[in-house]
Amino acid sequence: MLYEKFEHNINNLIGGFGLSKIAIAVSGGSDSVALLYLANIWAKKNNIELFVLSVDHNLRDQSKQEIEYIQNTANDLGLKFYSLFFDHQNNFSNLQERARKGRYDLMTSLCQKLDILVLLTAHHEDDYIENFCLRLERKSGVFGLSSSSVNWHNNTQIIRPLFNIPKSELVNYLATNNIKWFEDQSNLSTKYRRNTIRQKLAKEEVYIKDDIITQQIKVNELIENKFKPELISAIAESVKISEYGFAFLDLIKFSGFSQEVRVQLINFLLIIISGQQRSARFYSVEPILKLIRQSLDFKNTLHGCVIKRMQNKLLIYREFGKKLPESKLLLDKQLVWDNRFRITKNHDIENCVATYLSLEDYKIIKEKLDLEVLKNLSCGNHNAILFTLPIVKILEKVVAIPHISYYDNDIKSFNVSFAPDFTSRFTHFY
């Protein structure tokens, strides 16, 4: 039966953690509504408090009805309900990806406030099949083709207990129990590649899906048993990440790793140093590997980073100028700037802005800057890296560059630590 299968999955995924409360993401579609009812049975059986989270993207006319339905259902089941709102700001560029990140940011931030460690989502077997086909079409490497029923976002564990359950079983469960759900009409639009793949798969014989599932399992086993342990060792042995937000890669040790791990290792560093959330495509990393194999010094850019070879070292630092970091007002004691640096305000100072060093600012204060430590650590690349570091300004005046201990008075009012907003399912431990 469906519940027994679900119970087996969720117990294997989180059964041993001794949690007292868990959150669940519910959209109103068949998948998440089925998950809500299954999780409710399991939570009550295990004396776990279940929190229902729903995000209104304000993109469809029926979204208000869906939120209202989910709230009423949660109330009927005796569960706490939280409605969140994603503001797309009338910007429809790359909307699916932005909405996905936006709702995960909203839900995991709420989980942190509620002291909830685990968020359940309704990704099912068909979703995994579609993802595999999409990534295969995009020529993803073996790491990109792999999947997991456990992920992380914003230090919240994302659990997918429906990973091996087809959508048809979920729909049948709802229909049999006379449970209402909503159909998202955007799932029928062929402007999204995923929908086109879904429609093609629907016309295929069952054995085609079974074959894809078999391929996915083999890839996952290869990652778990071979490449993931190698990647973790590779990071420990060959990578040095500086508090100044740059990294060095030992190319002698790098040459001894498998091709798959080399690609993932470069990607790992690009994400951390750039502050971006997504990894570079496999085909865009390959030219960098080709340059490395030629054993000649080079300087290139990729994924918001400068990649520079210096004999047997590869230096990676953030590219300055192409996409400048957003200036942020230091209203609270701490903030994260450029998705990479955590700035702490040690004293109650008003009108502080975290931003980047402009050429005009540099000309004014350059005679007062001591760059000797940064110069030594970066092997002479201090001038370029200086412009990637956060500074603090008050009324357009540079008052602090904490990394190089520059302050316009004797009070050390700000501290900075390199804390990139990055979590990888391949290297995250719990």
From Swiss-Prot:
ATP binds at residues 27-32. CDD domains: TilS_N (cd01992). One of its GO terms (biological process) is tRNA modification. Keywords: ATP-binding, Cytoplasm, Ligase, Nucleotide-binding, tRNA processing. It is found in: Cytoplasm. One of its GO terms (cellular component) is cytoplasm. The keyword Magnesium does not apply. InterPro entries: Rossmann-like_a/b/a_fold (IPR014729), TilS/TtcA_N (IPR011063), tRNA_Ile_lys_synt (IPR012094), tRNA_Ile_lys_synt_N (IPR012795). The N-terminal region contains the highly conserved SGGXDS motif, predicted to be a P-loop motif involved in ATP binding. Belongs to the tRNA(Ile)-lysidine synthase family. Ligates lysine onto the cytidine present at position 34 of the AUA codon-specific tRNA(Ile) that contains the anticodon CAU, in an ATP-dependent manner. Cytidine is converted to lysidine, thus changing the amino acid specificity of the tRNA from methionine to isoleucine. This is tRNA(Ile)-lysidine synthase. The lineage of its organism: Bacteria, Pseudomonadati, Pseudomonadota, Alphaproteobacteria, Rickettsiales. The gene is tilS.
